Design a protein with these regions (language model features):
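Phosphate-binding loop and its immediate beta->loop->alpha context
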Residues: 39-82
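Conserved small/polar residues in nucleotide/adenosyl-binding loops
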Residues: 206-210
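Conserved phosphate-binding catalytic cores of ATP/NTP-utilizing and phosphoryl-transfer enzymes
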Residues: 5, 117-141
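Gly/Thr-rich phosphate-binding beta-strand-loop-beta motif of the actin/hexokinase/Hsp70
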Residues: 5-30, 137-162
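Short glycine-rich, Thr/Ser-proximal phosphate-binding strand/loop in the N-terminal lobe
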Residues: 19-57, 156-182
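ATP/pyrophosphate-binding catalytic subdomain of soluble kinases
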Residues: 176-204
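Metal-dependent catalytic neighborhoods of phosphoester/phosphodiester hydrolases
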Residues: 95-100
C-alpha cells in the first residue's frame, strides 16, 4: 500500500455575522475528493451590526476579533497547519476602520487578512467545486445568502457563466440597511438570467445562521 503524506490547511472567514475557522486535511496529490474536515469553529461576533448601521466596527468588537484571531492562530499551530487563507467580507468592506483593523490583526497575531470584494467572494463560492453537485447539460443558479451580501453563480453545462454579488444579507435586512436599488438590481438580474438560461434550477444556500 502506498502511503501518502497528509497535510492540514486552514481557512478563516471574517463575515458579517460570524468568524469561522475551517481546517481540512489533504493528501500530497491535493485531490479535492480526498479532503477531509478536521475542525470547524464558528463564533458569532456580528460585526455587521456595527458596520452597516454606524459605518465603523466598535472598539469592543475589534478587541474581541483580535482575541479570537489569536485563539485561531493557536489552533492552527496545534493542528500543524502548513498554510492558510484569511478573508474578510462585507462588514469589513463597509467599515471605515476595516483596513485599520486588518493592520492591527497582523501586528498582534501575525495573521494576514485580505478584505475581498464581492466578485472575489462569489468566485470563492464557485471554487469550492460546487459544479460537482449538479448534473451536466443543465442550468443552475447557485445562491449563497450571507449576513452582509448575497452571491450568485450561474452554472450551465458544468461551466461557470456568471458570478455576481449584492449588498443584501440577513444582518443588513435586520438592520434595515438594504437599499431599494440593490433589491431592484438583484431582481432584474435574476429575471434576466432566468430568461437567458431556460429551464433553470435554483440552489439556495444560507450561510449566516443566527
Amino acid at each position: 500500500m502506498i502511503s501518502m503524506k497528509k497535510v492540514n490547511y486552514a481557512a478563516i472567514d471574517i463575515g458579517s455575522n460570524a468568524v469561522r475557522l475551517l481546517i481540512k486535511c489533504v493528501n500530497e496529490e491535493n485531490a479535492p475528493e480526498l479532503m477531509s474536515k478536521v475542525q470547524l469553529i464558528r463564533i458569532p461576533l456580528r460585526l455587521g451590526e456595527d458596520a452597516f448601521t454606524v459605518g465603523v466596527i466598535s472598539t469592543e468588537k475589534e478587541k474581541k476579533l483580535i482575541r479570537l484571531m489569536k485563539a485561531y492562530k493557536q489552533l492552527m499551530k496545534i493542528y500543524d497547519v502548513v498554510d492558510y487563507r484569511a478573508c474578510a467580507t462585507s462588514a469589513m468592506r463597509d467599515a471605515r476602520n476595516g483596513k485599520d483593523i486588518v493592520q492591527q490583526i497582523v501586528k498582534k497575531t501575525g495573521i494576514r487578512v485580505e478584505i475581498i470584494d464581492g466578485q472575489e467572494e462569489a468566485h470563492i463560492v464557485y471554487d469550492n467545486h460546487i459544479e460537482q453537485l449538479f448534473a451536466s447539460g443543465q442550468n443552475y443558479l447557485y445562491v449563497d445568502v450571507g449576513g452582509g451580501s448575497t452571491e450568485i453563480n450561474l452554472i450551465s453545462n458544468g461551466e461557470l457563466k456568471n458570478s455576481r454579488s449584492y449588498n443584501i444579507g440577513t444582518v443588513r435586512m435586520l438592520s434595515g440597511m438594504v437599499k431599494e436599488e440593490e433589491k431592484e438590481a438583484l431582481r432584474t438580474d435574476l429575471i434576466g438570467l432566468a430568461t437567458e438560461y431556460t429551464p433553470i434550477s435554483i440552489c439556495l444556500l444560507y450561510t449566516s445562521p443566527s
